[in-house]
Amino acid sequence: MINYSSCSYLLKLCRTLKHLHQFHAQFITSGRISNDFKQNSVFANVLFAITSISPSASASKEVVSYATSVFRFITNPSTFCFNTIIRICTLHEPSSLSSKRFFVEMRRRSVPPDFHTFPFVFKACAAKKNGDLTLVKTLHCQALRFGLLSDLFTLNTLIRVYSLIAPIDSALQLFDENPQRDVVTYNVLIDGLVKAREIVRARELFDSMPLRDLVSWNSLISGYAQMNHCREAIKLFDEMVALGLKPDNVAIVSTLSACAQSGDWQKGKAIHDYTKRKRLFIDSFLATGLVDFYAKCGFIDTAMEIFELCSDKTLFTWNAMITGLAMHGNGELTVDYFRKMVSSGIKPDGVTFISVLVGCSHSGLVDEARNLFDQMRSLYDVNREMKHYGCMADLLGRAGLIEEAAEMIEQMPKDGGNREKLLAWSGLLGGCRIHGNIEIAEKAANRVKALSPEDGGVYKVMVEMYANAERWEEVVKVREIIDRDKKVKKNVGFSKVLS
């Protein structure tokens, strides 16, 4: 039998929604608590217990629905209760309007917000697609009115939100206006600057920090690597080690990525040796980075050895290995590792299929690619994207199946990006050149010209094909077009997409 004194202890043991339902049912049927204050207290504790449920542990809508029903049992909910329900909605349904509706209700009831109120409402505004900047600015004004921006957690959250959904200068202005900062404040803004590709300003802010932590170093090293500033990433990593700091796996993987991009395999191997000397634990994240590095630098056997030693392979680890095999033209091994991945219980994603299709293309495994492409939706529940159609079109074109390749491109999603369509039609044009299919080459050339009018390489290919077929009248017509169009004439020996 549940009594008031045992409620808090029992709620701490609840880790799933089912446990909370059982507690709730026992609490109601016991009928032992008639005091409204105690009843409100129990429901407030139930509400707080819901925050410990992982968003992945239960269906998000079910969690929010249950939390809302519990909240409605509370008479005159306090600031704590409103903060808790707002937090639950933000954690489980960040893109919904629930968090904001509860905040509006809170203000309508004249319940005063505190330091815990605004951060989760800010996050809910940022989680919505494209963000709700107008509402964020309104909430910003309210936080100022209540004097809550003096709280660093609130300030740091707002800086992060501005960096996500507004021009980065908004976050910088807020940073400059508030002299009260901690290392998290700097880290949040550095991360925002990196995401905005303002790497120079990120470095300036990093250099001005009175105190740095691992996150500070990781953010900048990762930013350099992402923007292909490989030397700067490697140099910063070396500086970090020279200062006696112990880099974690995030810094190591980012630097390995920079080594792979720059082809500096010796430095990458030295970093791998460093992990061995320091006896760092090679988790799936670091193993993925090492596999990716060695595969990109041409050491596919070493990549395979590291892959096999990894005991906790994730989707990303498998993708790194499969992509590496595809890059090296090992089509049969690519398919073999794909089968092993599926057998191990890992569900493939779109990246997996792009790599497998590329591997099949390099090895001429047409039937295997067809089967995998057909199974993407039916067997693996993976949506086909523009790149998948492009890979199939390239594979079919290489194999001389020009008509089928053209049909594949025609099936590409109508709302897809022009770049992917351009690459697909250009690849088909290249296949037509190899196999001498002028009829489809003309169709492909027209599509390429429509998507990239200044690409002179198209005309060069058509002149070559017409000349090989001794269709001299068409050769003359194409040359006349080249002579008339100055832009085409300028780029006739150059193509962005044709080899």
Swiss-Prot record:
One of its GO terms (molecular function) is RNA binding. Pfam families: E_motif, PPR, PPR_1, PPR_2. PPR repeats lie at residues 78-113, 114-150, 151-181, 182-212, 213-247, 248-282, 283-313, 314-348, 349-379, 385-419. GO terms for biological process: RNA modification. Keywords: Repeat. Residues 424-499 are annotated as: Type E motif. It comes from the Eukaryota. Gene3D superfamilies: Tetratricopeptide repeat domain. Signal peptide: none annotated. PANTHER family: PENTATRICOPEPTIDE REPEAT-CONTAINING PROTEIN, PENTATRICOPEPTIDE REPEAT-CONTAINING PROTEIN ELI1, CHLOROPLASTIC-LIKE ISOFORM X2. Belongs to the PPR family. PCMP-E subfamily. This is Pentatricopeptide repeat-containing protein At5g61800. The gene is PCMP-E8.
